[in-house]
Amino acid sequence: TYTFCIALCICSFVSAQLSENACISLVTCTPGNEVYTRYGHSAIRVCDTTAQLDVVFNYGIFNFDTDFFYWKFVRGETWYELGITSTPWFEYEYKQYKRPVYEQELNLTPEQKQALWQALITNYQPENRKYLYNFVFDNCATRPYQLIKNALEDSIHSDYIGYKGQTYRTFLRHYTGAHRWINAGINL
Protein backbone atom coordinates (compact mmCIF):
# COMPACT_ATOMS: atom_id res chain seq x y z
CA THR A 1 0.00 0.00 0.00
CA TYR A 2 2.92 2.34 0.68
CA THR A 3 4.18 1.98 -2.91
CA PHE A 4 0.64 2.53 -4.17
CA CYS A 5 0.41 5.83 -2.25
CA ILE A 6 3.71 7.01 -3.72
CA ALA A 7 2.57 6.01 -7.20
CA LEU A 8 -0.67 7.91 -6.67
CA CYS A 9 1.28 11.02 -5.63
CA ILE A 10 3.55 10.68 -8.66
CA CYS A 11 0.56 10.42 -10.98
CA SER A 12 -0.65 13.77 -9.67
CA PHE A 13 2.65 15.31 -10.77
CA VAL A 14 2.58 13.85 -14.29
CA SER A 15 1.69 17.09 -15.99
CA ALA A 16 3.37 19.26 -13.38
CA GLN A 17 6.51 21.24 -13.92
CA LEU A 18 9.35 20.77 -11.51
CA SER A 19 10.14 23.94 -9.59
CA GLU A 20 13.40 25.82 -10.02
CA ASN A 21 14.48 24.28 -6.69
CA ALA A 22 14.25 20.72 -7.99
CA CYS A 23 17.36 18.54 -7.92
CA ILE A 24 17.92 15.35 -9.85
CA SER A 25 20.67 12.95 -8.82
CA LEU A 26 22.22 9.70 -9.90
CA VAL A 27 22.18 7.29 -6.96
CA THR A 28 24.78 4.52 -6.86
CA CYS A 29 24.71 1.61 -4.41
CA THR A 30 27.64 -0.65 -3.67
CA PRO A 31 27.55 -4.37 -4.55
CA GLY A 32 26.02 -6.89 -2.17
CA ASN A 33 26.38 -10.61 -1.53
CA GLU A 34 23.31 -11.96 -3.32
CA VAL A 35 23.71 -12.85 -6.99
CA TYR A 36 21.32 -10.11 -8.09
CA THR A 37 23.27 -7.52 -6.04
CA ARG A 38 26.79 -8.49 -7.12
CA TYR A 39 27.02 -5.68 -9.67
CA GLY A 40 25.79 -2.86 -7.45
CA HIS A 41 22.79 -0.73 -8.30
CA SER A 42 21.89 2.66 -9.78
CA ALA A 43 18.73 4.75 -9.64
CA ILE A 44 17.57 8.33 -10.17
CA ARG A 45 16.45 10.58 -7.32
CA VAL A 46 14.10 13.52 -7.90
CA CYS A 47 13.85 15.97 -5.02
CA ASP A 48 11.65 19.05 -5.29
CA THR A 49 11.13 20.60 -1.86
CA THR A 50 8.71 23.16 -3.27
CA ALA A 51 6.43 20.35 -4.46
CA GLN A 52 7.20 18.23 -1.36
CA LEU A 53 8.51 15.48 -3.60
CA ASP A 54 11.50 13.27 -2.79
CA VAL A 55 11.46 9.95 -4.63
CA VAL A 56 13.77 7.42 -6.23
CA PHE A 57 13.04 5.91 -9.65
CA ASN A 58 14.37 2.39 -9.35
CA TYR A 59 14.83 0.15 -12.41
CA GLY A 60 15.76 -2.79 -10.17
CA ILE A 61 12.34 -4.11 -9.18
CA PHE A 62 11.70 -7.80 -9.85
CA ASN A 63 9.60 -10.67 -8.57
CA PHE A 64 11.93 -12.83 -6.51
CA ASP A 65 9.21 -15.50 -6.36
CA THR A 66 9.54 -16.12 -10.10
CA ASP A 67 10.08 -19.83 -10.75
CA PHE A 68 13.80 -20.60 -11.16
CA PHE A 69 14.73 -16.96 -10.49
CA TYR A 70 18.50 -17.49 -10.18
CA TRP A 71 18.62 -19.65 -13.29
CA LYS A 72 16.68 -17.06 -15.29
CA PHE A 73 18.82 -14.25 -13.87
CA VAL A 74 22.16 -15.71 -14.95
CA ARG A 75 20.68 -16.55 -18.37
CA GLY A 76 19.36 -13.00 -18.82
CA GLU A 77 15.72 -14.07 -18.84
CA THR A 78 14.41 -12.07 -15.89
CA TRP A 79 11.74 -9.39 -16.21
CA TYR A 80 12.48 -6.23 -14.24
CA GLU A 81 10.48 -3.06 -13.92
CA LEU A 82 10.66 0.55 -12.88
CA GLY A 83 9.39 1.27 -9.40
CA ILE A 84 9.11 4.47 -7.39
CA THR A 85 10.07 4.64 -3.73
CA SER A 86 10.40 7.45 -1.22
CA THR A 87 14.05 8.40 -0.79
CA PRO A 88 14.10 7.67 2.97
CA TRP A 89 12.70 4.17 2.36
CA PHE A 90 15.21 3.49 -0.44
CA GLU A 91 18.11 4.56 1.80
CA TYR A 92 16.75 2.54 4.74
CA GLU A 93 16.67 -0.65 2.67
CA TYR A 94 20.34 -0.31 1.75
CA LYS A 95 21.39 0.60 5.30
CA GLN A 96 19.75 -2.65 6.48
CA TYR A 97 22.26 -4.58 4.36
CA LYS A 98 25.18 -2.26 5.19
CA ARG A 99 25.51 -1.24 1.55
CA PRO A 100 26.65 2.37 1.15
CA VAL A 101 24.63 4.64 -1.14
CA TYR A 102 26.29 7.50 -3.02
CA GLU A 103 24.52 10.40 -4.67
CA GLN A 104 25.75 12.68 -7.44
CA GLU A 105 23.59 15.71 -8.12
CA LEU A 106 23.34 16.30 -11.85
CA ASN A 107 24.19 19.78 -13.12
CA LEU A 108 21.12 20.19 -15.32
CA THR A 109 19.34 23.22 -16.70
CA PRO A 110 15.66 23.63 -15.76
CA GLU A 111 14.75 22.41 -19.27
CA GLN A 112 16.93 19.32 -18.93
CA LYS A 113 15.45 18.56 -15.50
CA GLN A 114 11.94 18.81 -16.92
CA ALA A 115 12.86 16.61 -19.90
CA LEU A 116 14.33 13.96 -17.58
CA TRP A 117 11.31 14.19 -15.25
CA GLN A 118 8.90 13.70 -18.15
CA ALA A 119 10.96 10.76 -19.44
CA LEU A 120 10.80 9.13 -15.99
CA ILE A 121 7.04 9.65 -15.79
CA THR A 122 6.63 8.20 -19.30
CA ASN A 123 8.78 5.20 -18.32
CA TYR A 124 6.60 4.68 -15.25
CA GLN A 125 3.43 4.26 -17.30
CA PRO A 126 2.18 0.65 -16.96
CA GLU A 127 2.88 -0.17 -20.61
CA ASN A 128 6.52 1.03 -20.29
CA ARG A 129 7.61 -0.21 -16.84
CA LYS A 130 8.73 -3.75 -17.61
CA TYR A 131 11.87 -4.75 -19.47
CA LEU A 132 13.89 -7.91 -20.04
CA TYR A 133 16.93 -7.47 -17.82
CA ASN A 134 20.37 -7.98 -19.34
CA PHE A 135 23.30 -7.49 -16.97
CA VAL A 136 25.45 -5.96 -19.72
CA PHE A 137 23.16 -4.03 -22.06
CA ASP A 138 19.84 -3.30 -20.35
CA ASN A 139 19.80 -2.88 -16.59
CA CYS A 140 19.53 -0.47 -13.67
CA ALA A 141 22.69 1.34 -14.79
CA THR A 142 22.07 1.58 -18.53
CA ARG A 143 18.47 2.78 -18.18
CA PRO A 144 19.30 5.89 -16.07
CA TYR A 145 22.33 6.58 -18.29
CA GLN A 146 20.18 6.58 -21.45
CA LEU A 147 17.54 8.83 -19.88
CA ILE A 148 20.16 11.30 -18.65
CA LYS A 149 21.93 11.24 -22.01
CA ASN A 150 18.64 11.89 -23.84
CA ALA A 151 17.75 14.76 -21.48
CA LEU A 152 21.13 16.30 -22.22
CA GLU A 153 20.40 15.91 -25.93
CA ASP A 154 23.51 13.81 -26.49
CA SER A 155 25.86 16.42 -25.01
CA ILE A 156 27.55 13.66 -23.00
CA HIS A 157 30.78 12.70 -24.68
CA SER A 158 33.06 9.94 -23.55
CA ASP A 159 36.52 8.87 -24.51
CA TYR A 160 35.80 5.42 -23.12
CA ILE A 161 36.89 2.76 -25.58
CA GLY A 162 36.25 -0.30 -23.48
CA TYR A 163 38.50 -2.79 -21.82
CA LYS A 164 40.91 -3.84 -24.53
CA GLY A 165 41.46 -7.56 -24.65
CA GLN A 166 38.70 -8.33 -22.14
CA THR A 167 35.47 -10.10 -22.89
CA TYR A 168 32.25 -9.30 -21.04
CA ARG A 169 32.61 -12.58 -19.19
CA THR A 170 36.10 -11.68 -18.00
CA PHE A 171 34.92 -8.26 -16.90
CA LEU A 172 31.89 -9.68 -15.04
CA ARG A 173 34.07 -12.16 -13.12
CA HIS A 174 35.52 -9.17 -11.29
CA TYR A 175 32.10 -8.86 -9.61
CA THR A 176 31.17 -12.52 -9.28
CA GLY A 177 34.49 -13.61 -7.82
CA ALA A 178 34.82 -17.28 -6.99
CA HIS A 179 31.11 -18.06 -7.26
CA ARG A 180 31.49 -20.86 -9.79
CA TRP A 181 27.79 -21.45 -10.36
CA ILE A 182 27.25 -17.75 -11.20
CA ASN A 183 30.18 -17.85 -13.61
CA ALA A 184 28.84 -21.07 -15.12
CA GLY A 185 25.48 -19.41 -15.71
CA ILE A 186 27.11 -16.37 -17.31
CA ASN A 187 29.10 -18.66 -19.60
CA LEU A 188 25.93 -20.26 -21.00
Model-derived segments and spans:
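Sec-dependent signal peptide recognition
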Residues: 1-7
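Activation targets extended, charge/polar-rich intrinsically disordered C-terminal tails
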Residues: 122-188
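A structural motif
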Residues: 108-121
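Extracellular structured ligand-interaction cores
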Residues: 23, 41, 54, 103-105, ...
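Boundary of Sec targeting at the N-terminus
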Residues: 16-17
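Glycine-rich catalytic cores of cysteine/serine-nucleophile enzymes that process amide/ester linkages
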Residues: 20-98
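N-terminal signal peptide c-region/cleavage motif recognized by signal peptidases
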Residues: 11-13
